[in-house]
Amino acid sequence: MSKVIGIDLGTTNSCVAIMEGGEPIVIANAEGSRTTPSMVAITDSGERLVGQQAKRQAVTNPENTLFAIKRLIGRKFDSEAVKKDIAISPFKIVKADNGDAWVEVRGQKYSAPEISAMVLQKMKKTAEDYLGETVTDAVITVPAYFDDSQRQATKDAGKIAGLNVLRIINEPTAAALAYGLDKKKDEKIAVFDLGGGTFDISILELGEGVFEVKSTNGDTFLGGEDFDQDIIDWIAAEFKKDQGIDLRGDKMALQRLKEAAEKAKCELSTSLETDINLPFITADATGPKHLNLKLTRAKLEAICANLIAKLEGPCRTALKDAGLSPNDIDEVILVGGMTRMPIVQKKVQDIFGKVPNRSVNPDEVVAIGAAIQGGVLRGDVKDVLLLDVTPLSLGIETLGGVMTRLIEKNATIPCRKSQIFSTAADNQPAVSIHVLQGEREMSTDNKTLGNFELSGIPPAPRGVPQIEVTFDIDANGIVHVSAKDLGTGKEQSIRITASSGLSKEEIDKMVKDAEAHSSEDKKKRELIEARNQADSLAYSTEKSLKEFGDKIDAAEKQKIEDGLAALKKAMEGSDADAIKKASDELMQASHKLAEAVYAKAQPGEEQAGGAPHEGEAKDEKVVDADFEEVKEDKK
C-alpha cells in the first residue's frame, strides 16, 4: 500500500502530515510554512492561486479571492448560516440548481467541494514534493459536528482533488489520537477545538490503545472568522464615528480591515494593547483618510463576549451526554488557533474547573492525528482502536410529520439499526421514506438528508404490510438507508448524497476539470521557465555582441541580430515550444561570437596562471604528456 497522508482541511488554514519511521511528521509547503491558508483566488488572466499566494493579493482582488469556503460546504443557499455569510462576504455566493450554496468568480460558478479540492490539491502537491512520489491515499478531517451532507461534500472534494479518501475522521478525535498515542495510563479527556470556522467539543476515554468517543457536540458556525467579524464591525463603527465614512461599503477597504482585525486578535494573545494603523484607507473631497486606533485586550474581550458565552452550552451538553461531570475529566486538550486567546483559555478553565493542557500544537495536532489514522489503516501503527460516534440522531418522518429516531446521537460507528414500519392508508401501493438528521421532534425542524420511494406494495389494509427500514452508518459517518417489504422481499436503498450534494456526473466532470487545470498549471510553469531562460540568453548575447561584435564578420553578426529579434518576438507570445526553438536557433547562430569571447578571455587566463606564451597546440601537447606520465605511473 502506498503512503497515506493526513490532511486537516481547515476553514482558515490547512495542514498535511505523514507517518515516517513510526513518527508523524508535518510537511512544510513550498513557501516554507507548516500551515497553508485555505484561500483560492482567480486572477484577471484566469490563473488559480492557492494558499499564501492567494492571501497576498486578497486586498487588491477581494471579489475574486475565496476564503472560509468550508462554511459553505454541504449547505443550502437558503439556510440561515449561508445568509449570514452572504451579508459579510466580499465574493459572490449564488444558488445552485440543486439548492446548494455555490460561489461565482469572474462569471463562472464553482461548488464548495470544487474550491476545497483546489486547497486539497495544494496539500497533495506539498506531500508529493516532500516524498518525491505520487500520493493518492488520504485521511481527511472534518468538524465532529458536521452532518452527513457536509461529510459527503468533503469526501467529494477529496475525489475532485484526485485523492482516494480512505477515511473521514473527526477533528477532535484526530487530536486525541495525536495526544494519546504514547500515553499508557487510562484517562478521560475533553478535546476543546475552536478553529477558524467551527467549534467542537468531544469527550473521550483513552486506555490500552483504545480511543473511545463518549459524546460530541459543537457549532459548525462559530470560530475565528466570527471573532474577526466582530472586530471589523468595531473598527468600522469607530472610523464612522470619527470620520463619518462607512468603510463597510468598500470591498477593498473591508479586506484591509479583515487583515488588520486578524493581526490585532493574534497580537492581543501575547500583549495587552495593539495599534491598528491603516494609512490611505479611503478618501473623500477633503483628501485621503487614515485609520489609527488603539485596541486593548480588555476591549477585545468585551467585543467578543457574546461569542465566548456560546462556548459553554455545547460543553455542558457533551458532558451530560457522556454521563460525566467536569471533575471526572482528567485533561482538557486545546485544539485550533483560537484557543491561544487568553479569554478562551479562561472560559475553558471556568467550565471544566482545571487548567487546560497546552502540550500539543493547536495548528498541527489534527493533521498529525489524521496521519496516525492513515498509519493505522495502512498497518504501520499497531494496537490502536478508534471508536467514534455519530454527532446527530438519524431517523425518518412518520405519520403526523413526527421524526422517529432509529439511531440516537453519540451512537458508536460504524453501526446498523433496523425498525419495522407499515402503511398509513388502505391499499397503499408505495411508501415514501423521508430521511432526517437532527434533534428536534418535528421533521420540518430537522435536516433532510434525502427522500426515496419503495413501490410495488401489494394491496392490503393499512397497518398490515411490514416495511423494514435499515440505517447503516459507515466509519466515515456517511449514511446508507434501505427499505424492504418483508412480504414481497422487494428492496429499495439510497446512499445519502441526497437533494443536497453533487451527483456522480458532476463530480466526474469536476475531476476532469481539476486534471485539466493541473496540466494547464504545468504548461504555465514551462512557459515561465522558457521565458526566463530566453530572457537570460538574450541579455548575455546582446552584451557580448556590444563588446565583441567587431571580432566577427558582418554576415555572422546579422544572423545573431536576426536570431535575437526572433527570440524577442517569440517571448511576446505564449508558446513555450516556440520560445525554446528560437532560443536554440540563437545559440546556434552565436557560436562564432562565443569563440571570439573565448579567444579574448584565453590570453588573460594564461597570464593569470603563469603559463608560457605558446600556441594552443603546444598547450595541448603538454596536457597530453602529463596525462601519459600519470598513466605510466599508475602502471
Swiss-Prot record:
PROSITE patterns: HSP70_1, HSP70_2, HSP70_3
CDD domains: ASKHA_NBD_HSP70_DnaK-like
Region (Disordered): 598-635
Keyword annotations from UniProtKB, A to Z: ATP-binding, Chaperone, Nucleotide-binding, Phosphoprotein, Stress response
Extent of Acidic residues compositional bias: 625-635
Biased composition (Basic and acidic residues): 613-624
Induction: By stress conditions e.g. heat shock.
Function, in words: Acts as a chaperone.
Cross-referenced InterPro entries: ATPase_NBD, Chaperone_DnaK, Heat_shock_70_CS, HSP70_C_sf, HSP70_peptide-bd_sf, Hsp_70_fam
Coiled coil: none
Record-listed Phosphothreonine modification sites: 198
Similarity field: Belongs to the heat shock protein 70 family.
The keyword Glycoprotein is annotated on this UniProt entry: no
Name of the protein in question: Chaperone protein DnaK
GO molecular function, one term: ATP-dependent protein folding chaperone
